[in-house]
Structure formats: C-alpha cells, structure tokens
Amino acid sequence: FKKLGRPRLFFGISPGCMDSMVNKYTANKRLRSDDAYTPDARPDMRPDYPSIVYTQILKKLYPDVPVVLGGIEASMRRVTHYDYWQDKLMKSILVESGADLLIYGMGEKPVVELIRRFNDKRLSLNTIPQIAYLCKTTDFISEEGDIRLFSHAECLKDKKKQAANFRHIEEEI
C-alpha cells in the first residue's frame, strides 16, 4: 500500500468488475476453485469485502487522505442492504469502511468532476451527481424532490422499510 506513496488528490478503490463475494463464493457459500481476475486464477488472493478491508488499511496509513469508493460493490452497498453471506442487514459501505465518498453507477463522468473539484479546493463536492457521502442530519439541507430513505435502525426494526429503500435505489438506477 505504500509503494506508490501518498496521492495528490485521493485514493480510489474498486475491488473489480464483479462483486467480490460473488466472485469468491458459490451460491452455496463454498469457496470457488478459481478467480478469473487474479494471477494464476488463485481464489485466495483477495479478502472478503475488499473495499472495506483496503479502505481501513489506507485510513490507518494515511488518515488525512480522502478515500473514494467505486464500482459495483460500492454501488450496491451504498445504503442499508441485505448481505446474503452474513444473512443480515448491513450498514452502508461508507459506514463499514470509513471511506469519505462513494461514486455509484457508471462513474466516468462523476470521477472527472470530482477530480476537477478536488483540484479547486473551494468547490463543494456534495452537488456532484452520483456521489454519496455521510453527513450529520443537522448539516443536510433538504430540497424539493429529495427522497428520504429510512435509517439503518428503522430498517432493522421493519423489513418493509428496507424494501422501500431498495425500491427507490432500483428505480434510480
């Protein structure tokens, strides 16, 4: 992790073009015999939930450098979600990992805008489409047309609330 040194703007993490857990385990939760995306197809090269693991390592090594998540894993886990592998509802990957920002969906345009705004430190990042970040309720200014999702705690108490959240996310994509 230290070989390339401190980045000028941020660390970007994407565990690959396929969900890491689907790539690593079968539907019966058995370890797959090979991994098409690692050298020599070795199935033991990546940890479970690599976005979380890699972010936590980078935050320990470079606590002041922003970490931006992207890819299918970040997109699908940006809000409270059901985790098949642990058979429970999990918090947003932003909470679990400690990342600063998340780009969801097709990220080519948002990442270019994110870089532009990181270069010009005066510009706000929170108005870029397809960017997710954590903030305090008191810091959030609601606008007309915003969709309010249920909190993780509310989803744990009522599975219909989690289903409603998921519906909004699916319709957004």
Walk through the language-model features, giving the residues of each.
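Glycine-rich beta-alpha loop elements in corrinoid/cobalamin-binding modules
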Residues: 1-173
